[in-house]
Amino acid sequence: LRLARDWAIFIFVCAVIVALMTKGILWLLPKVNAMLAGPQSFDAASYDGTGYSFDADDERFVLVNTNLPFAEEPSPALADADEASGIQLEAEAAAAYQKMAAAAAEDGVALVLTAGYQDADARSAAYETQKQQYLEKGKTEEEAASLAADIQPPAECNDHGTGYAADILSTDYPTRDTGFDTTRAYEWLTAYAAEYGFILRYPQDRQAATGVVFEPWHWRYVGVENALAIRASGLSLEEFLALQKAS
């Protein structure tokens, strides 16, 4: 009887060990396969624009730049886009950003909203700070003003006054510089941001049209259909609007 009991215990222990090993292998296999396959690729869905209808009166197309300053200070209806920081965007844009950030998180990308709507005082302070940095480097007043505007437009020309502009970085790259375009977060945004209504506001090699240097962190809400059409065109917001209004 004792021998039979010992065998029963032995068989039970073996069964437990096998079960645990099987569970461990099943847990580990997907992770090993993912490692062998490499990082997940982010690929934008195709869009032919067949059903796109341009509406020149769409408020989300509000355009501001050094050649087209605000005629009057905007007053967008705001909502919290990020509750932790309290950063706000225009209400529709805020809801879209939250959906986008949640979708990115599901793909292992942690987006960080670092700036949204800014009032005139905040925009003016940002411009003056940038300008002062150039003055301290020995630039003249005129040179400093021009160089600052390429990066941080004056208050009346700053996209952040619309409520639709969002500076987006990631937890692993929290610095606003062009190096952000090497990150997985930028890759994700390039592929999927348009599906949530956001476009890259200042694309590379488009400074002649936008008046601002390449800013991979600066995204602009224009609505899903508009964003998909703009992304498909490969144009900046300025170029897209000019083309649509001319046709």
Give the location of each predicted region.
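Extracytoplasmic cell-surface/polysaccharide-interacting catalytic and binding patches
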Residues: R2-S247
